[in-house]
Amino acid sequence: MSAEHSSRRVAMVTLGCARNEVDSEELAGNLHQRGWDLIDDESSADVVVVNTCGFVESAKKDSVDTLLAASDTGAKVVAVGCMAERYGAELAEHLPEADAVLGFDHYGNLAERLDDVLAGRAIQPHQPQDRRKMLPITPVARPAAAAASEVAVPGHGWVPSTRGIARRRLDDSPLAALKLASGCDRRCSFCAIPSFRGSFLSRQPEEVLGEAAWLAEQGAKELFLVSENSTSYGKDLSDPRALETLLPRLAGIDGVDRVRVSYLQPAETRPGLVRAIATTPGVAPYFDLSFQHSSEKVLRRMRRFGSTESFLALIEQIRELAPEAGIRSNVIVGFPGETEEDFEELQDFLTRARLDAVGVFGYSDEDGTEAAGFDGKLDADVVAARVEQVSALADELVAQRAEDRVGTEVRVLVERDEDGEVTGRAEHQGPEVDGECVVVDAGGAGVGEVVHCRVIASEGVDLVVRPVGAAQDSSQLRGAGEGS
């Protein structure tokens, strides 16, 4: 307990992706071990730590709004995370409501910095730097360099001298994100993430396995493997097939029901990895493929690789091994130079691909990216119209794909039971964005249980399912199918 403050209560607020969730839970473990009390109620906290997102403009606005709302509680407010790392002193200057803006290099001693905030001691705002320059260009040289130079890498125990700090779960969900790696070596022209997340750095397999076993002990049934580019896992460990060998080991951990891989780079997705994900028992046949577009010309301007035909061939390869596999993607429309022909090609690709979930984003300039300086920018109203058109198409296509699953059997991980309405996800559904299963006649199935069900109806991207063997209530079935 601090001599300066008898009360050291902290609330963690997490924005953005699942990678940020992992970072927040490591920060929570750090703070708990150093005597801070973690609470959920921001209004009762002495300090609110906001783990910000700095990915796109809407996410940055959400981060600022959350920081302002935290300030309104009367607590001290500390900004961490990607937006804080990316903008640092600039954010501090424009947002005086934040009592401190801390970058990744502060994470190992966050508890001490929060003590400073409570004591009224000024903390110099984080000064951003290009984190790609902090590790060697050669991937295999990075693990040793990261250890020797004490480079802070979120989700990797921060730095070697503080490694071993326990992660602390912030909810009791049966799903837990597990970080494979941090950073990215790709240079997509529209993306700023590598500049503030740094070069790609894999976690050691034994470290990943150890954390996975701990998560299972905490009640996690599904492990959601996250990184900026999971297909690169192991390239800096002199083993480009490391993920293929890691997956069955993760799936074999006691208490783990399923392992799910996120963020696969299509151009790097090798046949061996496709087979491992599609056929390994305990690994969800689920492919989160970041296509972004399908026009080869647009992809080249994005500094990406692929084409409509190569992407369709990859999808065919997946479905030959696992016909019911879930395949999701994101696409960007209105990229500089995108012609009507490019736009039509993207829509044709989506129609032929029959994806289970599609996120549609309109292009907008991001600070510090190559694409921000491109010519051929489309008017904002044209971009908005294309977003609307592709979104409508995507909604129709994913609803058709969901309807195709009616009559099939799925394994549903129950995640919520709210006033008798039981919901969860099947193997083809990733968390939060890919739809869910509504379980009728659940028969007392509890959160964390896996239930063998038959799909009886669809409602958009969502499925209505009934446990196999449950008595059929024709009126309930009729009502469930009305929205399909």
Curated annotation (Swiss-Prot):
User: Could you tell me which residue ranges the MTTase N-terminal domain spans?
Assistant: 8-119
Q: Which GO terms describe its biological process?
A: tRNA modification
Reaction equations catalysed = L-aspartate(89)-[ribosomal protein uS12]-hydrogen + (sulfur carrier)-SH + AH2 + 2 S-adenosyl-L-methionine = 3-methylsulfanyl-L-aspartate(89)-[ribosomal protein uS12]-hydrogen + (sulfur carrier)-H + 5'-deoxyadenosine + L-methionine + A + S-adenosyl-L-homocysteine + 2 H(+)
**Keywords, A to Z?**
4Fe-4S, Cytoplasm, Iron, Iron-sulfur, Metal-binding, S-adenosyl-L-methionine, Transferase
Q: What Gene Ontology terms describe what this protein does at the molecular function level?
A: 4 iron, 4 sulfur cluster binding; aspartic acid methylthiotransferase activity; metal ion binding; protein methylthiotransferase activity
Tell me where it mainly resides: cytoplasm
- In this chain the TRAM domain maps to 403-469
Domain (Radical SAM core): give its ranges: 170-401
Q: Name one GO cellular component term.
A: cytosol
Residues recorded as binding [4Fe-4S] cluster 2, renumbered to this chain, are: 184, 188, 191
Cofactor binding note: Binds 2 [4Fe-4S] clusters. One cluster is coordinated with 3 cysteines and an exchangeable S-adenosyl-L-methionine.
Cofactors (names): [4Fe-4S] cluster
Kindly give the PROSITE patterns that the UniProt entry links to this protein. Answer: MTTASE_N, MTTASE_RADICAL, RADICAL_SAM, TRAM
Q: What is its EC number?
A: 2.8.4.4
Q: Which residues bind [4Fe-4S] cluster 1?
A: 17, 53, 82
Q: Which CDD domains match?
A: Radical_SAM
Which of the seven top EC classes does this enzyme belong to? transferase
- Where does it reside? Cytoplasm
Role of this protein: Catalyzes the methylthiolation of an aspartic acid residue of ribosomal protein uS12.
Q: Which family does it belong to?
A: Belongs to the methylthiotransferase family. RimO subfamily.
**Stated name of the protein:** Ribosomal protein uS12 methylthiotransferase RimO
Which organism does this sequence originate in?
A: Saccharopolyspora erythraea (strain ATCC 11635 / DSM 40517 / JCM 4748 / NBRC 13426 / NCIMB 8594 / NRRL 2338)
